[in-house]
Design a protein with these regions (language model features):
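Noncatalytic, helix-rich "gating/capping" subdomain that lines the substrate-entry/channel surface
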Residues: 1-189, 274, 310
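Intrinsic, low-complexity polybasic segments
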Residues: 434-447
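Alpha-helix N-cap/helix-initiation motif
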Residues: 159, 163, 264, 268, ...
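Active-site recognition of the HExxH zinc-binding catalytic motif
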Residues: 175, 182, 365-385, 409
């Protein structure tokens, strides 16, 4: 609340607002660099969207709305996290978990042991929920976990965490906020704050056109999946909790590989080393792990140096799922680059993911999709960390419209489909353990999944497997586009 109050008061500071207005209308404004002109323009925009032009009475109401929205946003996230963490299953019969990969079972067994329970522990966190949806042969288990997942923090669960009324309050307050600022709706407010799109109608027209083009392909994909589920899996109906499971089976049929086979070639140490080597070649930088106080033992901290050995950025990497973390993957700024008192303030970023942690004595193994996610978020990080702009308000990700900020991150994803990159960032986990690359611990007695080909002597992913992945790149792309 205090932070929200500070930002609300700052956005309505009449003295500062008037100073920026005077500067914008002066001859001196046109003598500023384009970067500094952009800072002034952005500040004036933010003052207006913060209620600086409102009457005294409306300013007070606007500030109340801001503080109440902040409280509701926080409560919404807390409810979702609490509802997610409230669910846990402890199966004790191995046959109930048929189809689940060995590394998932290892992690589930360790989680149950930590709770002092026998068997395995399954939760709604991504490292458990997603493999159950994709691999579990037990349809009843898939249905139970799916229904629980999609009804979290709703009227269908524990009323203590029901977000239904919060959503209504948020929508009403946003609408009132928009009207106070002179807009017809909150969508217009959102677009006015640093977006390329000019109107909600422009956005809706784009989405409708995209949906129109993608829908026939999605319908074809879904019909193909339904036919396969009926003929091959003997499912009378294709329910929501069957889609990921049936899709994995269908892809295996078409392309003769599975995510689990691919996963064996992406142990975390090798993936990070390959990622860092790539960006070092691309940008002439050097990334080094270093020690610093962190909020959890899993968190790593890195320095970035330029070709001359000068420190230019730092970042935290918090890659594993935990009960205290919100879901998904994201990059956020801790410190932005700026020039102050003749010296440059070094930018610092947070890189957050929710990947499976190491289990069974083995390093963490990433799916190819998780590798893409890592590259995506690191692209955001590079955008923030390698900026040369030295004005705080527009350095790094702050200087780009929100509907364009995904460009650097999606650009980085492309490298995950390049053989010259992938062959240097893959190594079979058995080879990694044997050679202790990157300090991975050596273990034994854990069976590997069935593979279509043995790993090469150096352990890199076989080219034939990569070619299969490339062939399957657009598998169900119609469904994915419509879902997105």
């Amino acid at each position: 609340p205090k932070i929200t109050q500070y930002h609300s008061e700052l956005a309505q500071h009449q003295g500062l607002f008037e100073k920026y207005q005077v500067l914008k209308n002066s001859v001196e404004f046109f003598q500023l660099s384009r970067v500094r002109q952009k800072v002034v323009e952005n500040e004036l925009r933010d003052f207006r969207l913060g209620g600086a032009e409102l009457s005294v009475e409306k300013k007070a109401r606007f500030m109340q709305i801001q503080e109440e929205l902040s409280r509701l946003y926080s409560k919404f996230e807390e409810n979702l996290l609490d509802a997610t963490n409230d669910f846990a299953l402890y199966p004790t019969h191995r046959e109930d978990l048929a189809g689940l990969p060995a590394d998932v079972l290892d992690a589930a067994k360790e989680a149950a042991a930590q709770d002092g329970k026998p068997g395995w522990k399954l939760t709604l966190r991504a490292p458990f929920w997603m493999p159950v949806m994709q691999y579990a042969d037990n349809r009843a288990l898939r249905e139970q976990m799916y229904r629980t997942y999609v009804t979290r923090a709703s009227e269908f669960g524990n009323s203590e965490w029901d977000n239904t009324s919060l959503i209504a309050q948020i929508l009403n307050l946003r609408q009132e906020k928009a009207r106070l600022l002179g807009y017809a709706n909150y969508a217009e407010v959102s677009l006015a704050r640093n977006k390329m799109a000019r109107s909600p109608r422009e956005v809706l027209d784009f989405l409708h056109e995209l949906g129109k083009e993608a829908r026939p392909y999605a319908q074809r994909d879904f019909a193909d999946l339904k036919r396969f589920a009926c003929d091959e899996l003997k499912l009378d109906t294709l329910e929501a909790w069957d889609i990921a499971y049936a899709s994995e089976k269908l892809r295996d049929k078409y392309y003769s590989f599975s995510d689990q086979e691919v996963k064996q070639y992406f142990p975390e140490p090798q993936v990070l080393r390959g990622l860092f080597q790539l960006v070092e070649r691309l940008y002439g930088i050097r990334i080094e792990k270093t020690e610093t106080p962190v909020w959890h033992p899993d968190v790593l901290f890195y320095n970035i140096y330029d070709v001359g050995g000068r420190l230019i950025g730092q970042f935290y990497a918090d890659l594993y799922s935990r009960s205290t973390k919100r879901s998904g993957a994201w990059m956020d700024e801790a410190i932005a680059r700026r020039r102050k008192n003749g010296s440059v303030q070094i930018p610092v970023a947070y890189l957050n993911c929710n990947f499976s942690a190491p289990a069974g004595g083995r390093p963490a193994l990433f799916t190819h999709e998780e590798v893409i996610t890592l590259f995506h978020e690191f692209g955001h990080g590079l955008h923030h960390l390698l900026t040369s702009v030295e004005e705080l308000g527009v350095s790094g990700i702050n200087g780009v419209e929100w509907d364009a900020v995904e460009l650097p991150s999606q650009f980085m994803e492309n490298f995950c489909w390049e053989w010259d990159v992938l062959k240097n960032m893959t190594r079979h986990v058995d080879i990694v353990e044997t050679s202790s690359i990157a300090g991975a611990a050596s273990v034994s007695g854990i069976a590997s999944p069935q593979e279509t080909s043995d790993p090469p002597l150096d352990g890199a992913m076989p080219r034939v497997l990569f070619d299969k992945m490339l062939s399957a790149k657009n598998f169900q792309s119609g469904m994915q586009t419509v879902r997105q």
